[in-house]
């Protein structure tokens, strides 16, 4: 699918990609079958808000089931979802199929309700934490990654601490962290309480230290376990090694 209807105050996607447009399940299934015939083992379903997919009453969970049923599809991933559209039905479908990867990208953006409201994210930190707990309940050992913006206009130190606190509660396997930068035509560009670059850098550095600790803790728990790894490319560090990903999206060098 293409486009987005969410209009987060920091995001230019609705202005550049337009409103949400979903393809029929049949057209997606046909394309996946052609990819399988060409030897592709892993399929990624893409969309700016992929789990808000809806076509003639069909849901994203139904699309996942249809793709999962295709013979020869060994792995299915999807990106990027919106937390508002993650639901129990989707999680139960993912848990029920072995070829749907045990991994979800779960963009938090902030752990402060005040900042989430200014971002127009349409969920609260409490809802986000609840759904993260449901993910781990329904899909044990699910890999969780996230996106987080630091230094959003008006963000106080206390609100930044709320984000760190929610990170501690959820413990993501990995995180894509960014200093806020204004985008043309967006509402946030017009906010007057812009944060200095020095403060943004200081907060980002502190956040990265915390995330590295969480990543290390979760990776250590995998030591001694058996994992299926799909080899994807030569390792950047050595032509004698290969790089691939586990079902839960951890990179492994072999």
Where are these regions (language model features)?
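Canonical Radical SAM [4Fe-4S] cluster-binding loop centered on the CxxxCxxC motif
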Residues: 1-26
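N-terminal pre-triad scaffold of radical SAM enzymes
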Residues: 1-9, 33-37, 41-44, 229
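Conserved, mostly hydrophobic/aromatic
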Residues: 8, 28, 45, 78, ...
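Alpha-helix N-cap and loop-to-helix initiation/capping positions
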Residues: 20-27, 58-59, 120-127, 155-159, ...
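Conserved SAM/AdoMet-binding glycine-rich loop
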Residues: 37-157, 168
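Radical SAM enzyme [4Fe-4S]-AdoMet core and its adjacent flexible, acidic
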Residues: 53-73, 119-122, 182-213
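Internal alpha/beta loop-helix hairpins
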Residues: 176-181
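Terminal RNA-binding accessory module
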Residues: 190-254
């Amino acid at each position: 699918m293409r486009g987005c209807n969410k209009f987060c105050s920091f995001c230019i996607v609705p202005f550049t990609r337009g409103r949400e447009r979903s393809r029929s399940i049949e057209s997606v299934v046909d394309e996946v079958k052609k990819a399988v015939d060409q030897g592709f083992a892993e399929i990624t379903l893409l969309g700016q808000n992929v789990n808000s997919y809806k076509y003639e009453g069909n849901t994203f969970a139904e699309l996942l089931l249809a793709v999962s049923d295709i013979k020869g599809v060994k792995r299915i991933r999807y990106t990027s979802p919106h937390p508002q559209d993650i639901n129990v039905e989707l999680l139960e479908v993912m848990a029920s199929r072995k070829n749907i990867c045990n991994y979800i990208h779960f963009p938090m953006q902030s752990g402060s309700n005040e900042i989430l409201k200014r971002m127009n994210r349409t969920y609260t930190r409490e809802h986000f934490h609840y759904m993260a707990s449901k993910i781990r309940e329904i899909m044990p050992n699910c890999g969780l990654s996230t996106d987080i913006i630091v230094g959003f206009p008006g963000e106080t130190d206390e609100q930044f601490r709320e984000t760190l606190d929610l990170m501690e509660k959820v413990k993501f396997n990995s995180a894509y962290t960014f200093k806020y930068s204004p985008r043309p035509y967006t509402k946030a560009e017009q906010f007057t309480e812009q944060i200095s670059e020095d403060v943004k850098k200081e907060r980002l550095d502190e956040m990265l230290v915390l995330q590295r600790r969480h990543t290390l803790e979760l990776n250590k728990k995998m030591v001694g376990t058996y994992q299926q790894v799909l080899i994807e490319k030569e390792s950047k560090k050595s032509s004698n090694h290969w790089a691939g990903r586990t079902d839960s999206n951890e990179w492994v060098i072999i």
